[in-house]
Amino acid sequence: MEKKLSSENNQLSSENILGLLPHRYPFALVDKVIENIPGERAVAVKNVTINEPQFQGHFPERPLMPGVLIVESMAQVGGIIVTQMQNLPKGLFVFAGINNVKFRKPVVPGDQLIISCDLLSIKRQRFGKVKGEAHVDGKLVCSGELMFSLVD
């Protein structure tokens, strides 16, 4: 699939995202990118709905989005940045680590996560690091540094 951007603010549709990332249901956790500076920064939207499978067990009486899925959403936005870098070898970049992750508020069905990631570094064209933040209604709900590695 060709990596096309929409004309407005370098946004990416869900179809564009599927062309950049290997994730599919139920792990496609980015609905659209609303700001995209390839290789530098991305801001994305994840709409949290009660229909998502994790809410059957986490928790039926009080559904909360698992923190690991918030972090995975941030990692996918970071992956969008890294996969668009022209000077890197082609291949699969995988989530390789996290530092300083903090969860500040619960995320529940009906929330809209606004996820921003900024590239911090690329080393030896194989390892990347981004700073990620997730907000709901303008309030920070999660932040941390995420690392990626190119798999041969």
Swiss-Prot record:
InterPro entries linked: FabA_FabZ, FabZ, HotDog_dom_sf
Signal peptide: none
Similarity section: Belongs to the thioester dehydratase family. FabZ subfamily.
Enzyme nomenclature, EC number: 4.2.1.59
Task of the protein: Involved in unsaturated fatty acids biosynthesis. Catalyzes the dehydration of short chain beta-hydroxyacyl-ACPs and long chain saturated and unsaturated beta-hydroxyacyl-ACPs.
Primary location group: cytoplasm
Active site: H58
GO BP terms, alphabetized: fatty acid biosynthetic process; lipid A biosynthetic process
Record-given protein name: 3-hydroxyacyl-[acyl-carrier-protein] dehydratase FabZ
GO molecular function: (3R)-hydroxyacyl-[acyl-carrier-protein] dehydratase activity
Gene3D superfamilies: Hotdog Thioesterase
Catalysed conversion reaction: a (3R)-hydroxyacyl-[ACP] = a (2E)-enoyl-[ACP] + H2O
Cell location: Cytoplasm
GO CC terms, sorted: cytoplasm; membrane
Family annotation (HAMAP family): FabZ (MF_00406)
Protein origin, superkingdom: Bacteria
Lineage, uppermost ranks: Bacteria, Bacillati, Cyanobacteriota, Cyanophyceae, Synechococcales
The entry's keywords: Cytoplasm, Lipid A biosynthesis, Lipid biosynthesis, Lipid metabolism, Lyase
